[in-house]
């Protein structure tokens, strides 16, 4: 994370007070890079360090990633003559907390991390991105870090934005900061070892972007979604390769296009909050049964029905959306969609969005609007219809 600080100080002699105004420009990069840990790649060694940099690196690696790629990661740093310390961590939503963050801090202290010259490197999925990003933003009040996401959620969602966080008091990401990594390297080769469920999990976030702003991406998922899963975005066929490249770039560009002008969320009408109104509560109450993207898809299915009932979608569009969700291996219903849970979820979201629902609903496929007048009765009716449509979609797929 780089930038220039500008400061102005104004003294008011009549009030015996001073007003300080400061601005800091933030610049960060998201870059596609095949074979990040190939011995000829130096991206990770050139980014994020002030001045002359250092030949030392502290690296946090997800334990599942370490089991598959650990020897290659160690070989990479050894080959380049980097004095490195690797902290291997088991992470997940159930341990996305301050205890996990504290373990990273303790390891950084033990390594003796230099504040500016030795950016922390984070290699793993979205949960690790969030926790380690929070640590980087807090450690000595701000330490640069680099991200190498290894899951689809990480590549197109958690790894490209500025938000960090941990769960607290039963709430998802209740404590967090805005702290983008100086550089995020997106390497689709990591998806080759991702299981089908976690691929589907990430496809939910890709579908979110498609539904709120990219009809062409929706059509791509409609036509080639199953191929993307079968080939794990590795492009084993010409069709699969073209689809994988287009889908990953469209989703990443779409996400950054939405985040960039509103990085600090000064505007709370955020189209990328689609699928994230009810899902935080559902996901936390369902732990560990639902993955993040699965909860998001359940939310999107509900809000698709809300949009249909309000005339924002026609029946054909509604059914196409449900069909794609099902084809991608995503749930469109969950027993937690009760009136009590939906009301609690909406109330918490209203507090998060400063007193208004600011609920994004799809308009057709590829458009979005925001509403503030959804009622409990409307939610209950939509959930009942959603349950029926979910069962119908499963029957059609069978």
UniProtKB/Swiss-Prot annotation:
Residues the entry annotates as binding NAD(+): 62, 93-96, 126-130, 150-151, 163, 172, 190-193
An example Gene Ontology molecular-function term: metal ion binding
Active site: 163
Keywords: Cobalt, Lyase, Metal-binding, NAD, Nucleotide-binding
CDD domains per UniProt: EEVS
Name of a matching Pfam family: DHQ_synthase
Gene3D superfamilies: 3.40.50.1970, Dehydroquinate synthase-like - alpha domain (1.20.1090.10)
Cofactor (UniProt): NAD(+); Co(2+)
Top class in the EC scheme: lyase
Keyword Transmembrane helix: no
InterPro entries: Dehydroquinate_synthase (IPR050071), DHQS/DOIS_N (IPR030960), DHQS_C (IPR056179), EEVS-like (IPR035872)
Reactions the enzyme catalyzes: D-sedoheptulose 7-phosphate = 2-epi-5-epi-valiolone + phosphate
Ligand binding (a divalent metal cation): 205, 276, 292
Cofactor note: Divalent metal cation such as Co(2+).
BP terms from Gene Ontology: antibiotic biosynthetic process
Listed EC numbers: 4.2.3.152
The protein's role, per its UniProt record: Catalyzes the cyclization of D-sedoheptulose 7-phosphate to 2-epi-5-epi-valiolone. Does not use ido-heptulose 7-phosphate and 3-deoxy-arabino-heptulosonate 7-phosphate. Involved in the biosynthesis of the acarviose moiety of the alpha-glucosidase inhibitor acarbose.
Family: Belongs to the sugar phosphate cyclases superfamily. EEVS family.
Protein name: 2-epi-5-epi-valiolone synthase
Taxonomic source organism: Actinoplanes sp. (strain ATCC 31044 / CBS 674.73 / SE50/110)
Gene name of this polypeptide: acbC
């Amino acid at each position: 994370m780089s930038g220039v600080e500008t400061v102005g100080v104004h003294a008011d002699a009549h009030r015996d007070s001073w007003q300080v105004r400061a601005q800091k420009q933030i610049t960060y990069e998201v870059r596609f890079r095949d074979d990040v840990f190939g011995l000829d790649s130096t991206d990770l060694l050139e980014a994020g360090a002030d001045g002359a940099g250092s030949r030392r690196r502290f690296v946090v690696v997800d334990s599942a990633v370490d089991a598959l790629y650990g020897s290659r990661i160690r070989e990479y740093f050894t080959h380049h003559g980097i004095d490195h310390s690797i902290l291997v961590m088991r992470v997940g939503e159930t341990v996305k907390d301050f205890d996990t963050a504290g373990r990273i801090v303790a390891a950084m202290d033990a390594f003796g991390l230099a504040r500016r010259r030795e950016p922390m490197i984070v290699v793993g999925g979205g949960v690790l991105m969030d926790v380690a990003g929070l640590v980087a933003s807090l450690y000595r009040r701000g330490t640069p870090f680099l991200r190498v996401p290894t899951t689809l959620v990480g590549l197109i969602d958690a790894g490209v934005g500025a938000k960090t966080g941990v769960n607290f008091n039963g709430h998802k990401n209740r404590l967090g900061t805005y702290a983008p990594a100086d550089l995020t390297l997106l390497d689709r080769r990591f998806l080759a070892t991702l299981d089908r469920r976690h691929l589907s999990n990430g496809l939910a976030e890709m579908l979110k972007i498609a539904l709120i702003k990219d009809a062409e991406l929706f059509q791509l998922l409609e036509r080639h979604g199953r191929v993307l899963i079968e080939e794990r975005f590795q492009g084993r066929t010409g069709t699969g390769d073209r689809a994988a490249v287009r889908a990953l770039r469209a989703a990443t560009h779409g996400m950054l296009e939405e985040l960039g002008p509103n990085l600090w969320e000064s505007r709370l009408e955020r189209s990328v909050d689609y699928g994230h109104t009810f899902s935080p509560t559902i996901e936390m109450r369902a732990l560990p049964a639902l993955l993040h993207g699965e909860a998001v898809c359940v939310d999107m299915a509900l809000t698709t029905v809300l949009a249909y009932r309000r005339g924002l979608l026609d029946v054909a569009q509604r059914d196409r959306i449900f069909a794609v969700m099902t084809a991608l291996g995503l749930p469109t219903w969950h027993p937690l969609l009760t009136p009590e849970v939906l009301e609690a979820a909406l109330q918490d979201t209203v507090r998060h969005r400063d007193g208004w629902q600011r609920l994004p609903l799809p308009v057709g496929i590829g458009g979005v609007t925001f509403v503030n007048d959804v009622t409990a009765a409307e939610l209950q009716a939509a959930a009942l219809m959603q349950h029926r449509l979910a069962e119908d979609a499963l029957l059609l797929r069978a």
